[in-house]
Design a protein with these regions (language model features):
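C-terminal binding/interaction regions
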Residues: 3
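Short catalytic helix/loop segments, enriched in acidic residues and glycine
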Residues: 10-11
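Short, flexible active-site-proximal loops enriched in glycine and acidic residues
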Residues: 20-26, 65-69
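Short, charge-patterned binding micro-sites
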Residues: 22-44
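C-terminal structural segments of small proteins and small subunits
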Residues: 42-80
Length: 80
């Protein structure tokens, strides 16, 4: 419960502030770790990169959070 009380407000803040999809997607049973997945859709790749940069900064700015790693994948319609 303590973990959820930290993670839920962060996920809700990211969704509201940046209009992205965000959810806790990993390490669900590990007390001191989590994985938060974020996705964004836009016509312009540059805009998606800017939004994801801002989301990363925002998540890292929470004093109760230590960002251990970030993985990013940007997919374009040209990739299909």
């Amino acid at each position: 419960k303590q973990k959820r009380s930290v993670v839920r407000p962060i996920v809700a803040d990211l969704r509201k502030r940046y209009t992205v999809s965000a959810a806790e997607v990993g390490h669900l049973d590990v007390h001191r770790r989590t994985v938060i997945g974020v996705s964004a859709v836009a016509a312009d790749r540059g805009h998606v990169v800017d939004v994801l940069d801002a989301v990363e900064r925002s998540a890292a700015a929470h004093p109760e959070v230590e960002l251990l790693s970030v993985r990013r994948r940007v997919v374009s319609s040209e990739d299909f």
